Amino acid sequence: MIKKFDKKDEESGSGSNPFQHLEKSAVLQEARIFNETPINPRRCLHILTKILYLLNQGEHFGTMEATEAFFAMTRLFQSNDQTLRRMCYLTIKEMATISEDVIIVTSSLTKDMTGKEDVYRGPAIRALCRITDGTMLQAIERYMKQAIVDKVSSVSSSALVSSLHMMKISYDVVKRWINEAQEAASSDNIMVQYHALGVLYHLRKNDRLAVSKMLNKFTKSGLKSQFAYCMLIRIASRLLKESEDGHESPLFDFIESCLRNKHEMVIYEAASAIIHLPNCTARELAPAVSVLQLFCSSPKPALRYAAVRTLNKVAMKHPSAVTACNLDLENLITDSNRSIATLAITTLLKTGSESSVDRLMKQISSFVSEISDEFKVVVVQAISLCQKYPRKHSVMMTFLSNMLRDDGGFEYKKAIVDCIISIVEENPESKEAGLAHLCEFIEDCEHTVLATKILHLLGKEGPRTPVPSKYIRFIFNRVVLENEAVRAAAVSALAKFGAQNESLLPSILVLLQRCMMDTDDEVRDRATFYLNVLQQRQMALNATYIFNGLTVSIPGMEKALHQYTLEPSEKPFDMKSIPLAMAPVFEQKSEITLVTPKPEKLAPSRQDIFQEQLAAIPEFVNLGPLFKSSEPVQLTEAETEYFVRCVKHMFTDHIVFQFDCTNTLNDQLLEKVTVQMEPSDSYEVLCCVPAPSLPYNQPGICYTLVRLPDEDPTA
């Protein structure tokens, strides 16, 4: 018997796991009991449980020992004990990939699959499909077709789910079962209907027309399964994002109609789908927000959490749409669930007024230590949106500095540091307070990335403060106490103080001379370089070599250096071979209006022209609808040999860079013109469409197609 532990033991973790100290060799030794006659179901169950526990804990089983245990386990099919038989099915599925000759149990599983015991049939189908390969699938095809349309829902669902897995092995064979899947889709059982819809979609997902027909059929005839409705909403949403009809499509009407469904799950899925559609207007969002507002007062914590989390996302882009929910969100501030209360406060910070900031900050500071790092990051992001209130910067800075002192992971600390840095850079009045908090933080900072980032900021902003000398101690402490990367960053920061403050220069030169004795090459090289530059006492040299740094493309330089090391050459590395980095374009930031941020309106004719131009290029035909085109950005000076402007066209998973090029040399004719791009690691250049020719003073257009990474926030 397994001892029953009380709640206190469970929470402390002491003795709550009876399998905690299992040894694989001892368990495999115990498995020999499978060969005994008569079979003892209770003892065999306990041993199978131990084997499954070890497998799920990641314990490695060798092929020979796994095969031995598997063959011994097959003898347990002689027992008629239901629990033992179902445990055998589980073990077969887990050991299918590590044992040899697992097909030996095919006949036993087929017998159970076609037998009269319904309790065996479903699990037997799942286990059989787990050990079946492409060559054996046709042998059980007849049984699978019968199982899909079986009257017993557990059998039908098992066959449908197994069909989904079998598609990866033999899509063509499973495609022949489409008629049976369609019959199952009309089942009265909610899970059978849901699984059947999943099979039908995966069989047709590469055929847009077939998927559209399937959607039309089910949206007209209706469904009994709330799970199937949720899947239909997701399919419709995916098609809508790729469609050119936009929100005038019948698909949008279907999703909106689901807001009036009797199932809460379907209502939330529809609201979430509408909110995540690109280019959604406030009018189109209104019904979804109204539904979420009702969920905010639900007695169910899961519904309240889902509603407030979704409203939190809406508030980032459409704060005015959420202001109607402010009263409901105020009521959630005191919710017993800390996650719900946190999201309610952060949403109100995005949508509320300046007068409410103090109260909300005080409210959240009372329990911020109790919430997880994930929600602390959400809090910091919400606070960063309140930067439009300069009079509240001191309150925000105090709150952030207190959070910075608390324990937390890298992402949490990074969010706080980024928020303080943005306040320092945008508000001169908060500069000294922000720098003081950051100096205190790097005295005990375990994250190299954050320490170097703060040192860079100190080097940039510190020399321009009224008393720059007070930061020198904090920076030089890093040279004495930290690792190589931080020491190197500290040396660069010191050099910037010496370059901009004549009174501090003698002290900085002494400190740099000490750094020349460092054990690390990088630190010594930087110190030597900066010392020699500063000793010249020339502002032009300081500007070129200390303030501005490298103007080349960093990814381009990395690739060029890697190529240089692969092909040994006597010639020195040529920096001129590296493409220059694009100068940062500082756009005037529009203040974050917590009521209604007016989106930048592009003339419809311009957007339509771009859509038409891009659709005419074969390489861009399948990119889907064009979401937005940026304003032209000038990449070169007007008087250079070649004048280049860039327009970025945003699609669902891609960006098209349009380069408008003009040749200003009257004695040259360029042909097949492209613009070389060096993307970061996670981005991928798929193709370039060159401009056929570029005669004198006649503009030409070339394009570059780049795939966005999955985790990219713009994707």
UniProtKB/Swiss-Prot annotation:
It is found in: Cytoplasm, Cytosol; Golgi apparatus membrane; Cytoplasmic vesicle, COPI-coated vesicle membrane. GO terms for molecular function: structural molecule activity. Its main location: cytoplasm. Pfam families: Adaptin_N (PF01602), COP-gamma_platf (PF08752). SUPFAM superfamilies: ARM repeat (SSF48371), Clathrin adaptor appendage domain (SSF49348). Residues 1-11 have a biased composition (Basic and acidic residues). The coatomer is a cytosolic protein complex that binds to dilysine motifs and reversibly associates with Golgi non-clathrin-coated vesicles, which further mediate biosynthetic protein transport from the ER, via the Golgi up to the trans Golgi network. Coatomer complex is required for budding from Golgi membranes, and is essential for the retrograde Golgi-to-ER transport of dilysine-tagged proteins. This is Coatomer subunit gamma-2. It comes from Rattus norvegicus. The lineage of its organism: Eukaryota, Metazoa, Chordata, Craniata, Vertebrata. The gene is Copg2.
